[in-house]
């Protein structure tokens, strides 16, 4: 790619679509992805942050509107869809969570719908929003799938991890939680260091696997769309992009479901009294 950011080869096209719209937190200026090195700790992917917040607000507004206008008569299509989603999530929570918290069902609903909406951004034409961003708003880069950004998925997983610690301490107490980390699986004081390492790794692996699984699947899906658009002639792209998009609908739904299920299971395990 030239210094001006002109796209001249398939390699340039693919690289351009893998760049984030970034803000340098030290200068509060947009980062030029074509003239700077790799991202540092002080760069913020504001495209991922923007779309994740907008989609989260859209979820809240739509569900609030449906709840406010819900009727006991014949429901409309939107109300029916919302009721089906709520019923599905509620049944999942009843089957997998055995505690008494009233927060888990709303949390599971939020996680499922929010992740699903972010995943669905991958079904938009790959050049649509980046083209608008570049030619209308003058943005140097734009990626529109928040869950294809590891910082977003790990941030969500970090929130789940904090809830795991909270519910573990709430149900078992500080002493019980500490004992769980130091006296399992070997119930003898001499094995406390070994137990702490084993249980610590097990505890930390939960948010890591949760975030990286979602990121890996969505990044791979986005990359395949980019490769199809970047390597094939325009008249032949639909032969691969349409079947992949149909198959990808299953992937994005499944990944949202898996993220929700693992969140419920981890919190159920944390809420168990020993």
UniProtKB/Swiss-Prot annotation:
NCBIfam families associated with the record: ATP_synt_6_or_A (TIGR01131), PRK05815.1-1 (NF004477)
Membrane-spanning regions, if any? Answer: 43-63, 103-123, 149-169, 223-243, 245-265
Q: Tell me the compartments it is located in.
A: Cell inner membrane
Classification via Gene3D superfamilies: ATP synthase, F0 complex, subunit A (1.20.120.220)
Q: Which GO terms describe its cellular component?
A: plasma membrane; proton-transporting ATP synthase complex
Designated name of the protein: ATP synthase subunit a
Its assembly, as annotated, is: F-type ATPases have 2 components, CF(1) - the catalytic core - and CF(0) - the membrane proton channel. CF(1) has five subunits: alpha(3), beta(3), gamma(1), delta(1), epsilon(1). CF(0) has three main subunits: a(1), b(2) and c(9-12). The alpha and beta chains form an alternating ring which encloses part of the gamma chain. CF(1) is attached to CF(0) by a central stalk formed by the gamma and epsilon chains, while a peripheral stalk is formed by the delta and b chains.
Q: A single Gene Ontology molecular function, please?
A: proton-transporting ATP synthase activity, rotational mechanism
- Entry-linked InterPro entries: ATP_syn_F0_a_bact/chloroplast (IPR045082), ATP_synth_F0_asu (IPR000568), ATP_synth_F0_asu_AS (IPR023011), F0_ATP_A_sf (IPR035908)
SUPFAM superfamilies per the record? F1F0 ATP synthase subunit A (SSF81336)
> According to its UniProt record, which protein family does this protein belong to?
Belongs to the ATPase A chain family.
Q: How does it sit in the membrane?
A: Multi-pass membrane protein
- GO process terms (BP): proton motive force-driven plasma membrane ATP synthesis
PANTHER family associated with the record? ATP SYNTHASE SUBUNIT A, CHLOROPLASTIC
Q: Which HAMAP family match?
A: ATP_synth_a_bact (MF_01393)
Primary role: Key component of the proton channel; it plays a direct role in the translocation of protons across the membrane.
Q: Name the gene that codes for it.
A: atpB
């Amino acid at each position: 790619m030239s210094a001006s950011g002109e796209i001249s080869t398939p390699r340039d096209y693919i690289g351009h679509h893998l760049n984030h719209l970034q803000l340098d937190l030290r200068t509060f200026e947009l980062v030029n992805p074509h003239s700077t090195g790799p991202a540092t700790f002080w760069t913020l992917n504001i495209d991922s942050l923007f779309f994740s917040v907008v989609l989260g607000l859209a979820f809240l507004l739509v569900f609030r509107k449906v709840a406010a206008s819900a009727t006991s008569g014949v429901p409309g299509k939107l109300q029916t869809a919302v009721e089906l989603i709520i019923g599905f999530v509620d049944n999942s929570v009843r089957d997998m969570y055995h505690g008494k918290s009233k927060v888990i069902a709303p949390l599971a609903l939020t996680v499922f719908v929010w992740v699903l909406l972010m995943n669905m951004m991958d079904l938009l034409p790959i050049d649509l929003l980046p083209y608008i961003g570049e030619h209308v708003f003058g943005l140097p880069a734009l990626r529109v799938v928040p869950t294809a950004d590891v910082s977003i998925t790990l941030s969500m997983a970090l929130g789940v991890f904090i809830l795991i610690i909270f519910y573990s301490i709430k149900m078992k107490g500080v002493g019980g939680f500490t004992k769980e980390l130091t006296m399992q699986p070997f119930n003898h004081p001499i094995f406390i260091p070994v137990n702490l390492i084993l249980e610590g790794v097990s505890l930390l692996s939960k948010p890591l696997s949760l975030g990286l699984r979602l990121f890996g699947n969505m990044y791979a899906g986005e990359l395949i769309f980019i490769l199809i658009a970047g390597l094939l002639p325009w008249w032949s792209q639909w032969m691969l992009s349409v079947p992949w998009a149909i198959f990808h609908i299953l992937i994005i739904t499944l990944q949202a479901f898996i993220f929700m299920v693992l969140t419920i299971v981890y919190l159920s395990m944390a809420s168990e009294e020993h």
